[in-house]
Design a protein with these regions (language model features):
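Non-catalytic terminal/accessory segments
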Residues: 1-183
Length: 183
């Protein structure tokens, strides 16, 4: 299904994908989202509800059915994220919100549906938070762009850092872009 979503999105950039809720609430889809979520290292870290991987796995089938019912009925409400502070190299603290595992499963299910749709819209040289890309891919691309058959072509590299970017994302504009692509 992800390939179909990617193909539809790439074929028609103005296409608005419909009925994603039906897709992400399919039992197999939620089960795969749970499998991926629970196989991550972070699954051992509980959210504000205190539920960890072991506790959730003990009642996974029931919890997935509850999530499905809540999503389909419109009654799903994510729990507040548990706030922790991670020390940064400059001595400051970075706030980190840790969602409950059930919310991470819903987020993963949404990612599995939305990522193939959005991938075709992103610039090919954009490397941040993309599947099959990393800092190493970006460095390799810059290196290739600066050399040609061993000869140096470019002399300038500009490093930039968008300070506290995720804290300053304009959510209204982001949601407007999402609504253009997904109904």
């Amino acid at each position: 299904m992800q390939r179909k979503l990617a193909t539809w999105a790439a074929t028609d950039p103005s296409l608005r994908i419909q009925r994603l809720l039906r897709l992400i609430t399919q039992p197999e889809w939620l089960a795969e989202a749970a499998r991926i979520t629970l196989s991550s290292k972070g699954a051992h870290t509980p959210g504000v509800d205190g539920v960890n991987k072991t506790m959730l796995q003990a009642r996974l089938a029931v919890e997935l059915q509850i999530l499905r019912d809540e999503l389909l009925s419109g009654h799903y409400q994510p729990l507040p994220a548990r706030r922790v502070y991670i020390p940064k190299s400059n001595g400051k603290l970075r706030p980190l919100g840790i969602p409950a595992l059930r919310d991470r499963i819903v987020q993963r299910a949404m990612l599995m549906a939305m990522e193939p749709i959005w991938e075709s819209d992103f610039h090919t040289l954009s490397y941040g938070f993309r599947p099959e890309s990393s800092v190493h891919h970006a460095i390799r691309t810059v290196k290739l762009q600066l050399t040609d058959c061993g000869e140096t072509r470019g002399r300038w590299v500009i490093e930039g850092d968008l300070s506290s970017y995720f804290d300053t994302v304009h959510h209204r504009l982001l949601m407007k872009a999402v609504r253009r692509r997904i109904s």
